[in-house]
Amino acid sequence: MSNVAENNDGVYDAPTGITAPPIDELLKHVSSKYALVIFAAKRARQINSYYQQADEGVFEFVGPLVTPEAQEKPLSIAMREIEAGLLDHEEG
């Protein structure tokens, strides 16, 4: 859902939601949208485990490869890493 611009001329602001990074840019790094979902979910799970283990002083997983923004979710971080080409994806 997006918000109507202040001048009420029917022009809409940029949509909110999962738009950054754009899906088209993410799909350049994988073979399909399904592979993207699995790839991003696995990396998000690793990032989440990293944060949980950091509290315990254990570092089994690699932390974020991009600088996380305040309150940024692990899935958003994973997608930014994929867009930046910081992760290698092997299917199979």
From Swiss-Prot:
Reaction(s) the record says it catalyses: RNA(n) + a ribonucleoside 5'-triphosphate = RNA(n+1) + diphosphate
Entry-linked Gene3D superfamilies: 3.90.940.10
Alphabetic keyword roster: DNA-directed RNA polymerase, Nucleotidyltransferase, Transcription, Transferase
The enzyme's E.C. designation: 2.7.7.6
Domain of life, source organism: Bacteria
One Pfam family from the record: RNA_pol_Rpb6
GO BP annotation list: DNA-templated transcription
Role according to the record: Promotes RNA polymerase assembly. Latches the N- and C-terminal regions of the beta' subunit thereby facilitating its interaction with the beta and alpha subunits.
Family: Belongs to the RNA polymerase subunit omega family.
Name used for this protein in its record: DNA-directed RNA polymerase subunit omega
Chain's gene name: rpoZ
